[in-house]
């Protein structure tokens, strides 16, 4: 059986390749799809760049997505191979969380309604808890990777940095020197942790929660670019943004702090921040729910061992004490969110290219990267 897809719009692009909006060439199938087309990896050989195949992140995403199925994880429909190019076909979502945040930052109300915020947050945690229960770390949670359907159903996407936790073939640090987008990167990663836990995902969720409240990134540091692929620079401005709000980490708050490779860098900061100002910040975003603050503080613990787990967060009183929110929060709401912007400014779109040829071979369960 051959399934074809007609590209009708360009969604976005990145280092991995491009994402398109598509429909099925089968007129009886009315669904919309998102097609992620990977560009081939290139390797410099003398003066020429040679195509060497699919990237490691693409292989990871394909393997992981074929093995998992959950209501809050974007569903893989099919893997396509055409002209040596691999594409992944996903279910389509009309929105992403970054777009929702930007919508509210420009609106008169300037706040995401509590019932919508609570539902989106719970669904993100629910999807991440499923990943963790299946020994998977996402490692790149951020608003742009949180897809949301027209009814408000969360679909976590982009598992290109996803990693199996159990029985890895290689240590985390040896295969991926840098994980998690800078504003959502946990302090143990900033301090050079070679081994880390799913707690890094929980920190990222805490940052996303704060961003939904304030409608701007909670810790917006300037990233220091890598000049040498073998040397990861200490992200001093990102660490500073965290300390300005949470205070300077200490051994009392974070046992084992001195064992991190970049611990010595903390002494280079001219100012020592003594207080955790998160409660005061919480008041400035006009939020008076003490249970929400408690959850946020438990997510943003310096010590990863003290950080709440995703499974524990699902049962936090912030969610269980309120039965008025649903997992379809956009229904019966006066707010109309515009759909993700789709462009036709791309050669694939202008040619209305049809993708086909299913990659039918089943993957085996695997261990490792």
Swiss-Prot record:
<feature type="binding site">
    <location>
        <begin position="11"/>
        <end position="19"/>
    </location>
    <ligand>
        <name>ATP</name>
    </ligand>
</feature>
<dbReference type="GO" id="GO:0005634">
    <property type="term" value="C:nucleus"/>
</dbReference>
<dbReference type="GO" id="GO:0000791">
    <property type="term" value="C:euchromatin"/>
</dbReference>
<keyword id="KW-0678">Repressor</keyword>
<dbReference type="GO" id="GO:0003713">
    <property type="term" value="F:transcription coactivator activity"/>
</dbReference>
<dbReference type="Pfam" id="PF00069">
    <property type="entry name" value="Pkinase"/>
</dbReference>
<keyword id="KW-0808">Transferase</keyword>
<keyword id="KW-0418">Kinase</keyword>
<dbReference type="InterPro" id="IPR011009">
    <property type="entry name" value="Kinase-like_dom_sf"/>
</dbReference>
<keyword id="KW-0010">Activator</keyword>
<dbReference type="InterPro" id="IPR008271">
    <property type="entry name" value="Ser/Thr_kinase_AS"/>
</dbReference>
<dbReference type="GO" id="GO:0140834">
    <property type="term" value="F:RNA polymerase II CTD heptapeptide repeat S2 kinase activity"/>
</dbReference>
<keyword id="KW-0805">Transcription regulation</keyword>
<dbReference type="InterPro" id="IPR000719">
    <property type="entry name" value="Prot_kinase_dom"/>
</dbReference>
<keyword id="KW-0539">Nucleus</keyword>
<dbReference type="GO" id="GO:0106310">
    <property type="term" value="F:protein serine kinase activity"/>
</dbReference>
<feature type="binding site">
    <location>
        <position position="36"/>
    </location>
    <ligand>
        <name>ATP</name>
    </ligand>
</feature>
<keyword id="KW-0460">Magnesium</keyword>
<dbReference type="GO" id="GO:0016592">
    <property type="term" value="C:mediator complex"/>
</dbReference>
<keyword id="KW-0479">Metal-binding</keyword>
<dbReference type="GO" id="GO:0004693">
    <property type="term" value="F:cyclin-dependent protein serine/threonine kinase activity"/>
</dbReference>
<keyword id="KW-0723">Serine/threonine-protein kinase</keyword>
<protein>
    <recommendedName>
        <fullName>Serine/threonine-protein kinase srb10</fullName>
        <ecNumber>2.7.11.22</ecNumber>
        <ecNumber>2.7.11.23</ecNumber>
    </recommendedName>
</protein>
<dbReference type="GO" id="GO:0046872">
    <property type="term" value="F:metal ion binding"/>
</dbReference>
<comment type="similarity">
    <text>Belongs to the protein kinase superfamily. CMGC Ser/Thr protein kinase family. CDC2/CDKX subfamily.</text>
</comment>
<keyword id="KW-0547">Nucleotide-binding</keyword>
<keyword id="KW-0067">ATP-binding</keyword>
<feature type="active site" description="Proton acceptor">
    <location>
        <position position="140"/>
    </location>
</feature>
<dbReference type="GO" id="GO:0060261">
    <property type="term" value="P:positive regulation of transcription initiation by RNA polymerase II"/>
</dbReference>
<dbReference type="GO" id="GO:0005524">
    <property type="term" value="F:ATP binding"/>
</dbReference>
<dbReference type="InterPro" id="IPR050108">
    <property type="entry name" value="CDK"/>
</dbReference>
<comment type="function">
    <text>Catalytic component of the Cdk8 module/Srb8-11 module which is a regulatory module of the Mediator complex that regulates basal RNA polymerase II transcription. The Cdk8 module may sterically hinder the interaction between Mediator and RNA polymerase II leading to transcriptional repression of a subset of genes regulated by Mediator.</text>
</comment>
<comment type="subunit">
    <text>Component of the Cdk8 module of the Mediator complex. The Cdk8 module is composed of srb8, srb9, srb10 and srb11. Interacts with med17 and med18.</text>
</comment>
<dbReference type="GO" id="GO:0045944">
    <property type="term" value="P:positive regulation of transcription by RNA polymerase II"/>
</dbReference>
<dbReference type="GO" id="GO:0140836">
    <property type="term" value="F:RNA polymerase II CTD heptapeptide repeat S5 kinase activity"/>
</dbReference>
<keyword id="KW-0804">Transcription</keyword>
<feature type="domain" description="Protein kinase">
    <location>
        <begin position="5"/>
        <end position="319"/>
    </location>
</feature>
């Amino acid at each position: 059986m051959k399934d074809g897809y007609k590209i009708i719009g360009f969604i976005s692009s990145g280092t991995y390749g491009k994402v398109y909006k598509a429909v099925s060439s089968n007129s009886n199938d009315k669904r919309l799809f998102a097609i992620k087309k990977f560009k081939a990896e290139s390797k410099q050989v003398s003066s020429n760049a040679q195509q060497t195949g699919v990237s490691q992140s693409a292989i990871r995403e394909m393997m992981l997505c074929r093995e998992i199925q959950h209501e809050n994880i974007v569903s893989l429909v099919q893997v396509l191979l055409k002209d040596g190019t691999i594409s992944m076909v996903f279910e389509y979502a009309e929105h992403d969380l970054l777009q929702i945040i930007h919508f509210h930052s420009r609106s008169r109300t300037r706040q995401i309604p509590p019932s919508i915020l609570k539902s989106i947050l719970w669904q993100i945690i629910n999807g991440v808890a499923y990943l963790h229960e299946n020994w998977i770390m996402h490692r790149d949670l951020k608003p742009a990777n949180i897809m949301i359907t027209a009814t408000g159903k969360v679909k976590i996407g982009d598992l290109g940095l996803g990693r199996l936790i159990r029985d890895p073939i290689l240590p985390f640090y040896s295969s991926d020197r840098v994980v998690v987008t800078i504003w959502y990167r946990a302090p143990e990663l900033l301090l050079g942790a070679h081994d880390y836990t799913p707690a890094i995902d929980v920190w990222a969720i805490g940052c996303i929660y704060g961003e939904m409240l304030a409608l701007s990134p909670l810790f917006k540091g300037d990233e220091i670019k890598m000049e040498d692929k073998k040397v990861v620079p200490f992200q001093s401005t990102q660490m500073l943004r965290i300390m300005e709000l949470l205070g300077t980490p200490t051994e009392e708050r974070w046992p084992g702090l001195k064992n991190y490779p970049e611990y010595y860098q903390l002494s280079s900061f001219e100012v020592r921040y003594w207080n955790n100002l998160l409660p005061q910040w919480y008041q400035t975003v006009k939020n008076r729910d003490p249970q929400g603050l408690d959850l946020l503080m438990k997510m943003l613990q310096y010590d990863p061992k003290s950080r709440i787990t995703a499974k524990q967060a699902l049962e936090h009183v912030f969610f269980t004490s309120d039965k008025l929110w649903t997992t379809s929060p956009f229904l019966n709401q006066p707010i109309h969110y515009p759909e993700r912007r789709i462009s036709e400014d791309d050669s694939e779109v202008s040619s209305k290219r049809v993708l086909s040829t299913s990659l039918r071979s089943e993957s085996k369960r695997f261990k490792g990267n």
